[in-house]
Amino acid sequence: MNEEMSGESPENNKHVKKPTMPEKIDYVFKVVVIGDSAVGKTQLLSRFTHNEFCYDSKSTIGVEFQTRTITLRGKLVKAQIWDTAGQERYRAVTSAYYRGALGAMVVYDITKRLSFDHVARWVEELRAHADDSAVIMLVGNKADLSVGKRAVPTEDAVEFAETQRLFFSEVSALSGGNVDEAFFRLLEEIFSRVVVSRKAMESDGGATVKLDGSRIDVISGSDLETSNIKEQASCSC
């Protein structure tokens, strides 16, 4: 009597791919993005984390974050990018928002002078609440509108950044221009500063600098590679 067997033969089974385990995240970098309302902070996050731009984006309410995973010397690093509302009524979340941040982007709109004039206040608040070693980058968004609509000359921003010892970049969340470069530069500098501090403490016989309990390896710019985005692309408009 013939019997029907369910499943596949052992010969066929050996060709079936087994489910892969999720890759282990080695490090987590918290980066905060601050600036006036409507300068494009949320759009910068969407462009960097999902390569998206939402035309009907609404103002952020409270605090939210998005992530993107990158590879540094074979280690997986999750960049956790925090976004907050620029309105004054949400400033009560300040302390918790800045806690643990290794880097920050202070964003202004190059077509709105007032948003740039407020940058000094944002930097002051950041330095009052964040760690002294946090890496800060001044970011002029909406560079795609520079012809005919620019209200903040690049020279003004460069001068302010130099005076305040900030990194500087002009980007376009709409076109994606220079967005990845700005974030990667910030993340590389975070690594550099943490490593330098760690080595200095070790040479003095002190405790090592730790990031989420993990060892930090020295990297060069060529070691920074983008990995596949681990999260599903979704517009958070």
Swiss-Prot record:
GO molecular function: GTP binding; GTPase activity
Lipidation feature positions (S-geranylgeranyl cysteine): C235, C237
Motif (Effector region): 57-65
UniProt KW keywords: Endosome, Golgi apparatus, GTP-binding, Lipoprotein, Membrane, Methylation, Nucleotide-binding, Prenylation, Protein transport, Transport
Tissue: Expressed in root tips.
Binding-site residues for GTP, renumbered to this chain: 35-42, 83-87, 141-144, 172-173
Sites bearing Cysteine methyl ester, chain numbering: C237
Gene Ontology terms describing biological process: cell wall biogenesis; protein transport
GO cellular component, one term: cell plate
Membrane topology of the entry: Lipid-anchor
Localization of this protein: Endosome membrane; Golgi apparatus, trans-Golgi network membrane
Family: Belongs to the small GTPase superfamily. Rab family.
Family matches, as PANTHER family: DRAB11-RELATED
Free-text function comment from the UniProt entry: Intracellular vesicle trafficking and protein transport.
Protein name: Ras-related protein RABA3
Organism: Arabidopsis thaliana (Mouse-ear cress)
Gene coding for it: RABA3
